[in-house]
Amino acid sequence: MQKGIIILGVSLLLTACDLGFPRMTVNYDNLPQGEIKEYITKRFPNEPEKEVLSKLIYAHLDGDNRADSIKKAVSQMGMTCEAGKEICEYSGYIRTKLTGHSSGSGRAKRIYHIVISPKKGMDSLAIEHQIIEDTEN
């Protein structure tokens, strides 16, 4: 009998504690597919690092750092390289929703914009990361 009361008490305590902690749901659907998305999702909630992303790109180059090779590599990884533009881009965002907290909407967009100019080489790689409140439904 006493053992049953202890088990019931522990169960109620765990349930009550679980209800009090904030939870985050994450939606990666608005990131373009590819190796860059995989890298961002593995790093989340941390920001992507330029050095690590550079190494991922270099691994695809096999020592050939010409503009065409860079363009081909980043395209295969999920970046968009439009004809007539000198840059390749990766733009997308992660939506997050925090529940079980007391202030604000709890919804945010983490926007990622990654740019490289294949003609200027790997040193031109730039990563912009911004967090804004998500006001969309």
Q: Which stretches of residues belong to each language-model region?
A:
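Terminal, regulation- and interaction-focused segments at domain boundaries
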Residues: 37-77
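Sec-dependent signal peptide recognition
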Residues: 2-8
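Short, low-complexity, Pro/Ser/Thr/Gly-rich segments in the mature regions of secreted, periplasmic
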Residues: 123-137
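Immediate post-signal-peptide N-terminus of mature secreted/exported proteins
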Residues: 25-35
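C-terminal motif of bacterial Sec signal peptides marking the signal peptidase cleavage site
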Residues: 14-16
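Bacterial signal peptide processing site
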Residues: 18-21
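A cross-family detector of function-defining hotspots
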Residues: 67, 72-117
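Short, linear, compositionally biased motifs with a strong N-terminal bias
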Residues: 10-12
